[in-house]
Amino acid sequence: MLPVDGEERKSEGSDTEGDRTSPCAVSSATLKDLEVGGSGRRCSDPAGQPSNLLPQRGLGAPLPAETAHTQPSPNDRSLYLSPKSSSASSSLHARQSPCQEQAAVLNSRSIKISRLNDTIKSLKQQKKQVEHQLEEEKKANNEKQKAERELEGQIQRLNTEKKKLNTDLYHMKHSLRYFEEESKDLAGRLQRSSQRIGELEWSLCAVAATQKKKPDGFSSRSKALLKRQLEQSIREQILLKGHVTQLKESLKEVQLERDQYAEQIKGERAQWQQRMRKMSQEVCTLKEEKKHDTHRVEELERSLSRLKNQMAEPLPPDAPAVSSEVELQDLRKELERVAGELQAQVENNQCISLLNRGQKERLREQEERLQEQQERLREREKRLQQLAEPQSDLEELKHENKSALQLEQQVKELQEKLGQVMETLTSAEKEPEAAVPASGTGGESSGLMDLLEEKADLREHVEKLELGFIQYRRERCHQKVHRLLTEPGDSAKDASPGGGHHQAGPGQGGEEGEAAGAAGDGVAACGSYSEGHGKFLAAARNPAAEPSPGAPAPQELGAADKHGDLCEASLTNSVEPAQGEAREGSSQDNPTAQPVVQLLGEMQDHQEHPGLGSNCCVPCFCWAWLPRRRR
C-alpha cells in the first residue's frame, strides 16, 4: 500500500508541477495567438498532428511505453521529472522560432514602408520641380509669342513703308522724265533762237549791203525793227538760260532726293535682314529648348515606368498589415495623379510644339512672299530700264518731228513769199509806163532783174532744204524703226503702223503698254511724214497750183501736221501787220528788201506770240502722250 500512496503523492506532485508550469504554457499560447492575429492556426508538431505536450490542469502527463510495462521504484523520481522537463523545453523552442520570423517580417515591412515614404517624398519634390519648370516654360513661350507678334507687326509696317517708297520712286522717275523732256524742249528752243539770231545777222548784213546801194529807202525803219528783234531775241535767250538753270537746279534736287530715298531703302533693307537673322536665331533656340523638353519628358516617363514596375512587383507571401495596404493604395493614387499630370504636361508640350510649327510655317511663308516681292521689284526695275531706252528714242523722234514741222512751216512761208513776189512782178508788168521813172535811169529793169534773181535763189534754197530734210527724215525714221523693231521686249510686237492707241494687254504692265503705244505712234508718224513730204514736193514743183497767201493752208500732211497747221494759223494772223508794213515800204523803196522785212516781222510776231515750250507747263506735244500714260 505504501507504493500506492507514493504514487498518489507523486501524481499529486506532478499535478502541482503541471499547475505550476501551466501558466507559462498559457502565456506562450496567448502570445502565439496574438502574433498570428486570428489566423486560426494551432500549435502543431512537424508532422501536422496536434501536440499533446501541453499539460492539462488536474491531469498527469502520460508516461512512455517502457515505464508503463516496468514497475518503477518508489524512490526513482527521474521517472516522474525528466519527461516533463524535456517536453517543456521542446515546446519553448518551437514557440520562439515563429516569433522571431514574425519580428523579422515586421522589420522588413517597416523598412519597405520607410523606403516607399522616401520615394513618395522624392516624387513630390520632382513633381514640384516639374511644375515649376513647366510654368517657366509657359512664361518663356508666351514671351516668345509676344516677340513674334511684334516682329510680324514690324514686318507689316516695313512692307507698307516699302510700298510707299516704291510709289514715291515711281513719281520721282515720272517727274524726272518730265523735267528731262522740258529741258530737251528748252535746248531745242535755244538752238532755234541761235539759228534765228544767225538768220537775223545774215539778214542784217543783207540789209546793210542794200542800204549801201540805196540808203534812201527804209533804212531807219529796218534798223529799228532789227534792233527790236535783236533785243527781244537777247531777252528771250536770257530768259531761256535762266529757265534752263532753274531746271538744272530742280533736276539736281530731284536726283538728291532720289539718292536719299535709295539710301533709306538700303538702310531699311539692312535692318529687315538683321531682324530676320534674329528671328532665325530665336527659332533655333526654340528648337533646342524643344529638344531639351522632349528629353526631359522622356526621362520623366522612364522614371514613371520604373516606379510602376516597382509597384507591380509581387509582394512577399506574408500578408501585409492593414495600415501598409492603405498607404500603398494612397501611394498608387498619388502615382496615378502624378502620371496624369505628366501626361497633361506632355500634351501641353505637344500643343506648344504644334503652335511652334505653325509659327515656323507662317514665318517661312512670309519669307517666301518677301523673296517673291523682291524678285518682282527687280523684274520691274529691269523692265523700266529696258523701257527707258525706247522712250528716250521716241522722245527724240517727237522732238525731231516738231523741228520738222517748224521747217515745213518755214518752207510754206517761203512759198507764200514766192507767190507774193510773183504777184508783185505781174503787177509791176501790168503797170502803165506813166508810173515808170524817167527813161535812162534803169530803175525798174534793175528791180525786175533783182526780183528774178531772188526768186531763183529762193527756189534753189527751198529745193535744197527740202531734199536735205527729206533725206534726213528718211534716215532717222529708218534708224528709229529698226531700233524699235530689234529691241527686246513687247514694245517691238506692238509697234504696228496702225497708230499709237495701244493699251497694255493682260500680260503687260502699264509702262510696257505705254512704250508699245509710243512705238506705234513713232512708226505712224514716220509713215505720215513720208506721205506728207511727197505731196509737199509735188506742190513745190508745181507753183501754179499753190494757194493764194490769204487762203487757208490745205491739209495735205495728214494727222501729223495738225499742230503745225494750228501754229501756222496763229503765225499768219500775227504776220499780217508786218506784211502790210513791208508792202508799203516796197511800194516806196526797193522791192528786194520785202522778203527780209517779212521774215523779220514774222520773227517778231513769233516772239510776241510764243509757240511750243514757252510756258512752264506741259508742252503741247505732250498732251497726246499724257492721257495714254494715265491709262
UniProtKB/Swiss-Prot annotation:
Residues 1-103, 127-154, 426-447, 488-520 are annotated as: Disordered. It is a peripheral membrane protein. Residues 1-20, 128-152 have a biased composition (Basic and acidic residues). It comes from Homo sapiens (Human). GO terms for cellular component: cis-Golgi network; cytosol; Golgi apparatus; Golgi cis cisterna; Golgi cisterna membrane. Belongs to the GOLGA8 family. Residues 93-103 have a biased composition (Polar residues). Residues 78-92 have a biased composition (Low complexity). Keywords: Coiled coil, Golgi apparatus, Membrane. This is Golgin subfamily A member 8A. One of its GO terms (biological process) is Golgi organization. Residues 497-510 have a biased composition (Gly residues). It is found in: Golgi apparatus, Golgi stack membrane.
